[in-house]
């Protein structure tokens, strides 16, 4: 999972966020932002992320509120013999008004509507999934729900809790970076003073 925040890119490929500075980002700014994000939990409220992570982890087809979805059946195309022309086996699953679906945690809704969720239709604020893989309408319906659960799990990933050891590590990095910054300022200041002392006799 990768999230852009200001001048920083957050990459969630490990249990902890790995912060990578953009090319135009200065080292001092990068360190200060890293410490701020980890120490102050500015990425989001801890409880919200825990709730969202637990919700995604427990998500399954049988636990979905079926009355929140609209199901439509149409005639399928492709191979299938006479059954294709006679039976409306193609299933289209729609979840309207995603932003107002209170049964989905807010943090999950934010991710689903961010453009990373392949089944999200921004214009109608809806999730639309289709399946005509089989000749059975019930099987196609089940496949729509399975696609929904699978895609949510793949798209919505949340970081684990930041340990005290990690926070301490980044505080040390910040302290070291501050010392280097002050030293650089002193060296620069001394250079300016030395240049001002040079006098030329003509």
Swiss-Prot record:
Protein name, entry field: Putative uncharacterized protein YOL114C
Top-level division of the source organism's lineage: Eukaryota
Species assigned in the record: Saccharomyces cerevisiae (strain ATCC 204508 / S288c) (Baker's yeast)
SUPFAM superfamilies per the UniProt record, alphabetical: Peptidyl-tRNA hydrolase domain-like (SSF110916)
GO cellular component terms listed in the entry, alphabetical order: mitochondrial large ribosomal subunit
Pfam family membership, one: RF-1
One annotated GO molecular function: peptidyl-tRNA hydrolase activity
Gene Ontology BP terms: mitochondrial translation; mitochondrial translational termination
Signal peptide stretch: none
Gene3D superfamilies noted in UniProt: 3.30.160.20
């Amino acid at each position: 999972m990768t999230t852009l925040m200001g001048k920083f890119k957050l990459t969630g490929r490990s249990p902890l966020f790995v912060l990578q500075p953009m090319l135009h980002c200065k080292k001092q700014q990068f360190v200060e932002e890293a410490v701020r994000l980890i120490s102050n939990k500015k990425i989001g409220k801890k409880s919200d992320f825990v709730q969202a992570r637990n919700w995604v982890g427990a998500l399954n087809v049988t636990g979905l509120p079926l009355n929140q979805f609209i199901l439509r059946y149409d005639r399928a195309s492709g191979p299938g013999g006479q059954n294709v022309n006679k039976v409306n086996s193609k299933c289209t699953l729609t979840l309207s008004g995603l932003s107002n679906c209170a049964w989905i945690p807010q943090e999950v809704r934010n991710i689903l509507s961010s453009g990373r969720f392949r089944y999200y239709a921004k214009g109608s604020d809806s999730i639309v999934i289709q399946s005509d893989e089989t000749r059975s309408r019930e099987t196609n319906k089940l496949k729509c729900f399975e696609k929904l659960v699978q895609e949510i799990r793949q798209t919505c990933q949340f970081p684990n809790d930041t340990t005290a050891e990690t926070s301490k590590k980044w505080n040390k990095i910040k302290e070291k970076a501050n010392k280097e910054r002050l030293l650089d300022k002193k060296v620069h200041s001394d250079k300016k003073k030395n240049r001002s002392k040079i006098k030329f006799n003509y």
